[in-house]
């Protein structure tokens, strides 16, 4: 049992246009009928482009640039692209994808990210993309890796090669949401390994995840890639939590 949502084989063989007729869609936020996951009015209201933020950690920063924290204590990653702020009602979509296996949300998350990338002038695309890996036990329990579900359509949209197994989680860490902020760095320290060092040496690696909270998980993964010779690491996350969280 994977927890994936799937259509009967007879429906999966139909063109997308036919499926839209047979399976009319409703907005995931307001419930009104629409052709996509989220209707245009809800997207404009709840998923408008983020205000100016730090180019490195994606925390709000009037005027943009790099925040004092990233200047004084540079994280291992070099840049972060975040499509939306993590808050109501979009936070419920993140939870539905992760814990209710509502996988059709993932391509919409990816499209929001791709739109954000397109709007960010001067952003260098990575040479390859990989998702933040789950531990084996959590992957078996959940049946899928939500970061990979977002990374697949994002890689296709950006025209960047996807390497799903570029890194692996070697330690079954406690979920960061269940750990105090002061303990989060220690919780993920040494949790990752690179499976193919030659593939990342001297290259720009893009890391995909659903949410960035403290940044410790992404920082540890970026540090792991840098130890194996990655030249640059950019995070691509659907949602960024406010600094106070």
Locate predicted features.
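Glycine-rich phosphate/pyrophosphate-handling loop used in enzymes and phosphotransfer proteins
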Residues: 1-245
